């Protein structure tokens, strides 16, 4: 019996972890708004004027932008809990965006703009229900152009960066060292009187930004999210304008598929020198989640001046770090990030390998100034200490780690370079995605338990239709109950999310199957007619951690007839999900 309860707690813990990663629950350093906090701390900046809504001054990296959003509470509650789930976000055919616009008013540096479009943004790591990253589109509902040089705001919550400095300093370094990147500064964001903390105000990758960076904003634009130039994956690049055509990307893929790459032909499609600079800069800054290490967070733009593609960095909220901060991966950024297909192939060519080494040395000699970077960090830390949200308790320690990276980076890279060219240990990584392997349809009647119950297989009532890997699953016995998740531990001020757990015995082999599902706390209530809520979770075949045990993720929708987190209360509803398994991510270390 003790083993059964332990298995249940592990199950609820792991699917809750999935929920934390995908449904926007807060992390320990997340800046949740305090209902008692009515106003943002003051910066003692001079009174703003409408002239500040010119891109030239608006994105001044030394300026902290003031953004005050007013939106109906019902609309805010609707958009802030919209989310992607891990499995559906990473299926091979990417799902449509779950985010929708609502009408709002915004005051930016004292300039009032009414009837703008407001929506949540983010892929996975930055999703948050309480401090969401936001898009503000001026002309979504009304034909208006209140600003010069930009037509929308991109406000990133820096959820993965407790310093709030990574995007600001990274994009500045990219631009200064020759890679076109968005301009960026910081913003104090308030929604309906509640202070959400310090965000990054990042220039949107739209025609005004492209015009500023390249001199012409009319070229083809694609966004890359967990994708690379593999022949069968090209159309996972997201078209961002009407000029975007997949044919040149298919040609790049065909060239990179060859064992010996035709560099001259590739150079007709990709600006090789520009890419080498982008590649070396990603490596220098420790961009573990960028194109060359994780095939993620980038745009490619076909510059009309030469019809060649240039790379633009994006999602730069986790640079200046020695390791990927999420166990068990802990990938260490190195002198050469070579997991991308383009970097991997180019490093095998002596000519481009030599040019990469030369460019890294040039970056270190001409642009990487420890004195300048440390002065920027020190100044920003002093300015932000009174502005970061009180829940951001790791701010000081994170700034210390940021400084440590700056102080030690040159020595680490020079030591690696002194050892000679890196020997590649394998081919490029296959981008990670999920493949559907089954489905589950459930109707259930359960009870809420404040503590994990005894004999869970005998609890509740379950009607289930389940298929896994082509097998129709039959159960000898299956039970259900609902409780708070027990793991991972959350900060005291973060409520523990609800879970719905099914434990059953499979007829075919007597194996135990555990089905764990979770929803955001705000959605754990009876649903209205024709309404469904997002459901995420896992399926465990066998006992987790034991030989032969298999874990798969599930994603879908559900309804609640009854739902209350109170001992003995009824929890009843339906669940429709698909089962997925990971494919790709053959990382070579």
Say what each PLM segment does.
Residues 2-14:
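Bacterial N-terminal signal peptides that target proteins for export
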Residues 1-3, 20, 202:
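A general, composition-driven signal for non-globular sequence regions
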Residues 25-569, 579-589:
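Phosphate/dinucleotide-binding and metal-coordinating scaffold of catalytic cores
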Residues 12-23:
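Bacterial N-terminal signal peptides
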